[in-house]
Amino acid sequence: MAGHSKWANIQHRKGRQDEKRGKVWTRIIREITVAARAGGADLGTNPRLRLAVERAKAANMPADRIKYNIDKASGTLEGVQYEEIRYEGYGIGGAAILVDTMTDNKVRTVAEVRHAFAKFGGNMGAEGSVAFQFKHCGQLIFAPGTNEDKVMEVALESGAEDVITDDDGAIEVLTAYPDFEAVKNALEAAGLKPEAADVTMRAENPIELTGDDAVRMQKLLDALEDLDDVQEIYHNAEIDAEAL
């Protein structure tokens, strides 16, 4: 199945994250904190914490720092209490945007998110205004040049829902949320390492943005990404690579 290109968008975000490793670590630590408090410190029984630890390792966070934050979150050490809040809104051309945050001060966070939307041409919506346009699922992205037939065979045999080849040759594997780890493990066991793998909110109906609209949309997304309390951003805009 063919699809739009996501490769340039992934590389753009990765480049920004590489420039701001300290902020990436902060986000991961918040995720570890919330995951451990919600499901306990045992990686074997807490898949959300397992995924957060994988992200930490991929970001080159030292093992002792990972352990420290798990211990702190699970009650061994005292720490900050975070609240998870999702904001919804519209970007350029009516593009749908979800903004997931973790915060110890929701008054500050909502003000910062609203300001970013307003400053860069978007607007915040009410709860439920755009969330229905996204599906909670597992997503794995493989670089252009990866053996498509092998990815498809292993992915579908291990329970993936779909395998999509994007316009630039990148391969996207989609799974139901509960099947994400099993599919990821099967692909990695077959020697197929994804460039990106995560549980995500995937847009059901993407819209294409080009030219000035694409540039403006990317500026809005970057502004939201730069907010300290923002963990993840999901949107349905297919942004022209020239705007990145």
UniProtKB/Swiss-Prot annotation:
Can you name one GO molecular function term for this protein? DNA binding
GO CC field: cytosol
User: Has keyword DNA-binding?
Assistant: yes
Q: InterPro entries under this entry?
A: Integrase-like_N (IPR017856), TACO1_YebC-like_2nd/3rd_dom (IPR048300), TACO1_YebC_N (IPR049083), Transcrip_reg_TACO1-like (IPR002876), Transcrip_reg_TACO1-like_dom3 (IPR026564), YebC-like (IPR029072)
Which SUPFAM superfamilies does the record associate with it?
YebC-like
The subcellular location is: Cytoplasm
Q: Chief subcellular site?
A: cytoplasm
Transmembrane region(s) = none
Q: Name one GO biological process term.
A: regulation of DNA-templated transcription
Pfam families linked: TACO1_YebC_N, Transcrip_reg
- Keywords for this entry? Cytoplasm, DNA-binding, Transcription, Transcription regulation
Looking at the keywords, is Transcription regulation present? Answer: yes
Q: Which HAMAP family match?
A: Transcrip_reg_TACO1
Q: Which family does it belong to?
A: Belongs to the TACO1 family.
The identity of this protein, by name, is: Probable transcriptional regulatory protein Rfer_2075
Q: Which organism is it from?
A: Albidiferax ferrireducens (strain ATCC BAA-621 / DSM 15236 / T118) (Rhodoferax ferrireducens)
